[in-house]
Amino acid sequence: MKNTIQTFKNAKYEGKKLSMLTAYDYSIAKIMDECDINGILIGDSLGMVIKGEENTLSVTIDEIIYHTKAVKNGVKNALIVSDMPFLSYHVSIEDAVKNAGRLIKEGGAHAVKLEGGSNVIKQIESIVNAQIPVMGHLGLTPQSVNSFGGFKVQGNTSETARQLIEDAKLIEKAGAFSIVLEGVPTKIAEMVTNSISIPTIGIGAGINCDGQILVYQDMLGMFGDFVPKFVKQYANIGDIMKDSIKNYILEVNTGAFPQEKHSFSINESELEKLY
């Protein structure tokens, strides 16, 4: 079934949970789509898990477009949402609409996601008015890592929790079709979810959100050096990959690979002409 922003909105009313994962290339996106994932996010998290940076701030709009194109080619049914990276919507309303439009027109995304609350309402309204669906993002917003002093849980005081709820209402009023809640206490995420009519997608925000999203490298266990508290690893793909690569190297070194079944032949009569 084709997933649209209406699918997301209906899911909340029907009590159906929404599943999302990040993806950055054709092959992974194709596998996810074949598993009937509801939505795929081309996240600026690619700065960390693809480029190896310590945060997301260096990611450019052109990089998001590049990876969105790749994901688009592997997807038939999932809703494709592209992140608007740092400074792609902060400088002016015109920049925000232009860059959101590029993600749709050049990248092939179905919607865009941007971080922030009351400070980005005008951007959300303008992008929505340009007929571009918007997903909001509240709580631990990685583009604000320097302001937060690191990747820390948000909304863990009555004052900040109240602000989260108010921001969620403002984002809904501005026309967003859903909101990501990241790094928020479970009870507060539940309060936010119950205060708005659009779905919330949680990442480190507990069980009561309308859906969940994870970075696929985290949930597949590709990196063993650090596992965020909110991540459940459904596999240890990193270990499987290492074992496979080691076996490949061993077989190349010992001459066990390639075998005859992996090789091509030439007609003997043609071969004789070369001698």
Curated annotation (Swiss-Prot):
Documented EC number(s): 2.1.2.11
InterPro entries linked: Pantoate_hydroxy_MeTrfase, Pyrv/PenolPyrv_kinase-like_dom, Pyrv_kinase-like_dom_sf
Enzyme class: transferase
Comment on bound cofactor: Binds 1 Mg(2+) ion per subunit.
Cofactors: Mg(2+)
Complexes and interactors: Homodecamer; pentamer of dimers.
Protein name (Swiss-Prot/TrEMBL): 3-methyl-2-oxobutanoate hydroxymethyltransferase
Organism for this UniProt entry: Clostridioides difficile (strain 630) (Peptoclostridium difficile)
